[in-house]
């Protein structure tokens, strides 16, 4: 099998396509959550903490010299990233919890008994005939 045919068979499987869609949606969801945290969650928290803008919080390790930029530890951006992660992780947890509860409900649903085989039907007919003969 040629490499192109193998790749086509691999890419056309349902799992690969589902995974690609999930990655694209996940990336878009991550951007939405990042904007939500940076633009909606953190400003009120900053106001509560005395007008702090978290994206500007940093430690200067080495001041800017000439054309060289300052060396800083931007812990404010890190705090925002941790909040992003926490919200995304919680949303994924809640989604998986909902999916798992639906799966459990499907598993708990009583299954219909299997249809009797031809042998079982024949034995039932013989039993019924014998019972009918005894009752006469």
UniProtKB/Swiss-Prot annotation:
The chain crosses the membrane at residues 9-29, 32-52, 54-74, 79-99. Keywords: Cell inner membrane, Cell membrane, Ion channel, Ion transport, Membrane, Transmembrane, Transmembrane helix, Transport. Signal peptide: none annotated. Pfam families: MscL. GO terms for biological process: monoatomic ion transport. It comes from the Bacteria. Gene3D superfamilies: Large-conductance mechanosensitive channel, MscL, domain 1 (1.10.1200.120). It is a multi-pass membrane protein. GO terms for molecular function: mechanosensitive monoatomic ion channel activity. It is found in: Cell inner membrane. GO terms for cellular component: membrane; plasma membrane. Homopentamer. Belongs to the MscL family. Channel that opens in response to stretch forces in the membrane lipid bilayer. May participate in the regulation of osmotic pressure changes within the cell. This is Large-conductance mechanosensitive channel.
């Amino acid at each position: 099998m040629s490499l192109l045919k193998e790749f086509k068979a691999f890419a056309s499987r349902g799992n690969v396509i589902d995974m690609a869609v999930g990655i694209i949606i996940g990336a878009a969801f991550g951007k939405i959550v990042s904007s939500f945290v940076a633009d909606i969650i953190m400003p009120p928290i900053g106001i509560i903490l005395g007008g702090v803008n978290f994206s500007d919080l940093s430690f200067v390790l080495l001041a800017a010299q000439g054309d060289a930029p300052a060396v800083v530890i931007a812990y404010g951006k890190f705090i925002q990233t941790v909040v992003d992660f926490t919200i995304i992780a919680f949303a994924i947890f809640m989604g998986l919890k909902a999916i798992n509860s639906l799966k459990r409900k499907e598993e708990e649903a009583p299954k219909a008994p299997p249809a009797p085989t031809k042998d079982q039907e024949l034995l039932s007919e013989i039993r019924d005939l014998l019972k009918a003969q005894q009752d006469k």
